[in-house]
Each structure stands twice: as structure tokens, then as C-alpha cells.
Amino acid sequence: MSTKKTFEENLQDLEAIVTKLETGDVALEDAIAEFQKGMVLSKDLQKTLEDAEKTLVKVMQADGTEMEMDA
């Protein structure tokens, strides 16, 4: 049974992929596979941030204060 990685773990994985691709020492096929993994991680991280922002807005509204957040 696999456990879901934390935001920080996914961010570290994405940073490792970016570093690996920036070195240029990766075969084309491997680079494409790593790029695809990176895109999936990037989308997951973005969704996590958007969900966190929505949660914060709800908390602020429940508290009675208004807060506008730029999306």
C-alpha cells in the first residue's frame, strides 16, 4: 500500500527532476519521461496550492473577516 507523498516531498521530487534535466546528461527518452513526471508533479502541486488557498479563504470568511486573494 503506497502512501501519498506530502507537498514538500513532491516539491523535492520536482526540483530533482529539474536539476537532472538542466544538467543535460540525460538520454532523450529518459528526458521525455522525466519531463512528463515533472509535469504531473507540477499540476499536483498547483492543485494543492489552489486547494490550500480556497481553504484559507473559507476560514477567513467563517471568521467574519473579508479577504480578497488574487488567483
UniProtKB/Swiss-Prot annotation:
Where it mainly occurs, coarsely classed, is cytoplasm
Q: Keyword Repressor, does the record have it?
A: no
Q: Which HAMAP family match?
A: Exonuc_7_S
Catalyzed reactions per annotation: Exonucleolytic cleavage in either 5'- to 3'- or 3'- to 5'-direction to yield nucleoside 5'-phosphates
Q: Name one GO cellular component term.
A: exodeoxyribonuclease VII complex
Q: Of which family is this protein a member? A: Belongs to the XseB family.
Gene designation per UniProt: xseB
Which one GO biological process term can you cite for this protein?
DNA catabolic process
**Which keywords appear in this protein's UniProt record, sorted alphabetically?**
Cytoplasm, Exonuclease, Hydrolase, Nuclease
Q: Which domain of life is it from?
A: Bacteria
- EC supergroup of this enzyme: hydrolase
- Please provide, alphabetically and separated by semicolons, the GO molecular function terms listed in this UniProt record: exodeoxyribonuclease VII activity
* Protein's name according to its UniProt entry: Exodeoxyribonuclease 7 small subunit
Q: Which Pfam families match?
A: Exonuc_VII_S
Location of the protein in the cell: Cytoplasm
E.C. number(s) listed in UniProt:
3.1.11.6
Q: Cross-referenced InterPro entries, in alphabetical order?
A: Exonuc_VII_S, Exonuc_VII_ssu_sf
Q: How does it assemble?
A: Heterooligomer composed of large and small subunits.
Functionally, this protein is described as follows: Bidirectionally degrades single-stranded DNA into large acid-insoluble oligonucleotides, which are then degraded further into small acid-soluble oligonucleotides.
Xref: Gene3D superfamilies: Exonuclease VII, small subunit (1.10.287.1040)
Q: Which organism is it from?
A: Streptococcus thermophilus (strain ATCC BAA-250 / LMG 18311)
